[in-house]
């Protein structure tokens, strides 16, 4: 699936989902699934990634704020295996018996 690398924003970021499903994960293991109309708030300094699902597209508008002329710090890439594992875990936790 298409996703960002891990990154942080010194002044935060808002993700506005416009189509499909968007996954957002943080370094502490929290994964959110957002759908059209949802807004995901990424607080300043929180290490995170975001992207589409494994078998479906997702689109979002990212609104990023600046602090001292800087809006993002890019970090390490999220490997395909790690991404797949995180998205599958998030999907599994949302299933209803």
Q: Where in this protein do the model-derived segments appear?
A:
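Short, conserved beta-strand element in jelly-roll/cupin
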Residues: 8-24, 63-66
């Amino acid at each position: 699936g298409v996703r960002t690398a891990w990154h942080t924003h010194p002044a935060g970021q808002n993700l506005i989902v416009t189509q499909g499903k968007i996954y957002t994960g943080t370094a502490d293991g929290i994964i959110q699934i957002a759908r059209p109309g949802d807004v995901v708030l990424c607080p300043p300094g929180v290490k995170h990634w975001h992207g589409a699902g494994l078998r479906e597209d997702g689109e979002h508008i990212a609104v990023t704020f600046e602090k001292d002329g800087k809006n993002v710090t890019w970090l390490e890439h999220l490997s395909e295996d790690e991404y797949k594992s995180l998205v599958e875990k998030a999907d599994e936790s949302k299933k209803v018996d």
